[in-house]
A protein has these predicted regions:
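Core SAM-dependent methyltransferase catalytic element
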Residues: 225-252
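S-adenosyl-L-methionine
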Residues: 102-131
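A short acidic, Gly/Pro-enriched loop at the edge of an enzyme's catalytic core
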Residues: 131-142
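Conserved beta-strand signature within the Rossmann-like core of class I S-adenosyl-L-methionine
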Residues: 174-182
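Conserved Class I S-adenosyl-L-methionine
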Residues: 113, 190-215
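Class I SAM-dependent methyltransferase Rossmann-like catalytic core
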Residues: 30-54
Length: 252
C-alpha cells in the first residue's frame, strides 16, 4: 500500500515537473522571437519587461487575446509572438485615435501589419463596444498606459466602469485583463501628467467584479510622479501599476 502511494506521488511530481518544463520552454521560445522586432521596439523592453509581464498574466500559446487601445501596436506584436500561429490577436483602436499626431498611430499600425507580417493579428478600428465579437471570445486582454485617459476626464468614473464591463463581457470565464498604467498622486493634475490617480481608480476597478491581483514588476520608486510621462527625464521609466483582473469562473 505504501509503495502504491509513493509511486502515485512520484508519478504526479514527475507529471507536474514535465508540465512546468514544457511551459517554461514555450515561454522561452516565444520570448526569443522578440529579438526579431525593430530596434525601436526592443529599446522599450527594459522598462516594459514584456516577457515577464505576459508570463505573470498567464498569456501564452494558442490564446485569443486583445490589445485594447493598441495605438501603434507595440504590445500587439509582443502578443503576436506570445500566442503563436495557433492564437489570435485583436488589435483594437477607437477610430478617433487616428486623428492624433497627424495620423501617426494609423501609419505605425499599418507599417507593422504590412504584407501580412503578423499573420495572427486582426486589426479592429472600432470602439470597444462595437467590436462585433461575441461575448466570451477572449482568453485575455491587455490595456497598457491607457486607462488614465478614460478615467481622468469628466464622467471618468462612469466611463471607466463601462470600459471594464465591456471588456469583462468579452472575456471567457477565467479570462484575464492585464491593466498597466503610469502611477499618479491624488494631489496632482494627472490629466496634464498623463498619469493614473490610483487612489481614485481602485474603487472603479474593484467594483467591476474581477478577482484582482497586483505585481511590483513595473514599479519604480525613483519616479517622484511629478513629471509628465513624456518628459525625457522619466519617459519609459515611470512608476507603473500592473493589475491582473480575472473574470470569475462562474462568469460573475
Amino acid at each position: 500500500m505504501k509503495n502504491r502511494v509513493f509511486l502515485a506521488t512520484a508519478l504526479r511530481t514527475l507529471v507536474l515537473a514535465a508540465l512546468a518544463v514544457t511551459a517554461f520552454a514555450a515561454q522561452a521560445d516565444w520570448a526569443a522571437g522578440l529579438s526579431a522586432r525593430s530596434p525601436e521596439d526592443q529599446v522599450r523592453d527594459a522598462g516594459r519587461k514584456p516577457a515577464e509581464v505576459l508570463d505573470w498574466l498567464g498569456i501564452g500559446r494558442g490564446m485569443t487575446v486583445m490589445d485594447l487601445v493598441a495605438s501603434g501596436g507595440w504590445y500587439t506584436e509582443v502578443l503576436s509572438n506570445a500566442v503563436g500561429s495557433e492564437g489570435v490577436v485583436y488589435a483594437q483602436n477607437p477610430p478617433m485615435i487616428y486623428n492624433f499626431r497627424d495620423g501617426f498611430y494609423d501609419k505605425a499600425m499599418s507599417a507593422r501589419l504590412k504584407d501580412g507580417r503578423l499573420a495572427n493579428v486582426v486589426r479592429l478600428d472600432r470602439d470597444i463596444n462595437e467590436t462585433g465579437l461575441q461575448p466570451g471570445t477572449l482568453d485575455a486582454a491587455i490595456t497598457a498606459l491607457n486607462f488614465h485617459d478614460i478615467v481622468n476626464n469628466p464622467g471618468g468614473a462612469q466611463a471607466g466602469a463601462g470600459f471594464l464591463a465591456t471588456v469583462k463581457a468579452l472575456l471567457k470565464p477565467g479570462g484575464v485583463l492585464g491593466l498597466i498604467d503610469h502611477v499618479g498622486d491624488s494631489d496632482k493634475n494627472n490629466t496634464e501628467l498623463h498619469r493614473l490617480d490610483v487612489e481614485a481608480a481602485l474603487p472603479i476597478i474593484e467594483a467591476a467584479g474581477f478577482e484582482m491581483a497586483s505585481s511590483d514588476l513595473l514599479r519604480n520608486p525613483d519616479d517622484d510622479r511629478i513629471a509628465m510621462v513624456f518628459n525625457p527625464v522619466i519617459r519609459g521609466q515611470t512608476d507603473r501599476v500592473l493589475y491582473k483582473l480575472t473574470k470569475p469562473a462562474d462568469g460573475g
